[in-house]
Structure formats: structure tokens, C-alpha cells
Amino acid sequence: YGHDQGDYAIKRICNEIIVSIRQSDSLYRIGGDEFAIILVETNISKARTIGENIRKRIEKVVAVGQDKITISIGISSFDFNNESEDEEKLFKRTDNALYESKNHGRNRVSVITA
């Protein structure tokens, strides 16, 4: 499809994510087609629900040409009270959850906790 269609898809995905999260949450693009969302003061159950809502919205409304776009989502948590916890461990767990989604058929949400 080319760069123009890819850019269009990424913008649409961002818009769908933005309307699915709260103002206190943050969306970051961390790679070509990879994003991170920080859900402030959100437990794993609520994060999974938000992830599923985002996945369903994108599956329903984002397309390039005749092809529907799907996403895979990985979720993990960060415990501020655990002194051995750090951002690198959180990112690694979340990345592992993402690859679990990708390895099990894509278009799904996976959770790995500490």
C-alpha cells in the first residue's frame, strides 16, 4: 500500500486509542507500528478491558483499502512499592505479553504480571 496508506493507518489507530483512554493516560509511539500506553492508577482487570475496547474499535473501523487492520496488545503492571521494580523490567514484561499475543494468532490482548 505504500507510506501514505501506512501513515493514514497509524493516524487512525492513534485516534481510536486516544478516544479510548482517559486524559490522565498517555500514548507513546515507540517504533514504526508499536505504541505504549500508560494507564495511570489502573488495575490489570481494567487495563485488559481498555485493551479489549481498543482492539475491538480498531478492528471495526480502521482499514487500508479493503483490508481490515487488527492489533495485538501486551499488558503488564508496575508496582511502585516494589523497590526491585524498574521501567526496564516493566517494558520487558509488556513486550513479552505483546509477543504472546502475536504468537497466538494476533488480534488479541495478553497480560503478564510481575
Annotated model-derived regions:
Residues 1-19, 28-32, 36-37, 44-52, ...:
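Conserved long alpha-helical elements within nucleotide-processing catalytic cores of c-di-GMP signaling
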Residues 16-26, 62-66, 104-105:
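Nucleotide second-messenger and two-component phosphorelay signaling modules
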Residues 29, 57-74, 102:
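Catalytic core regions of nucleotide second-messenger enzymes
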Residues 38-42, 59, 78-79, 114:
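Residue-level recognition of strand-loop junctions within catalytic nucleotide-signaling folds
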Residues 44, 48-51, 78-112:
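Catalytic-core segments of nucleotide cyclases and related cyclic-nucleotide turnover enzymes
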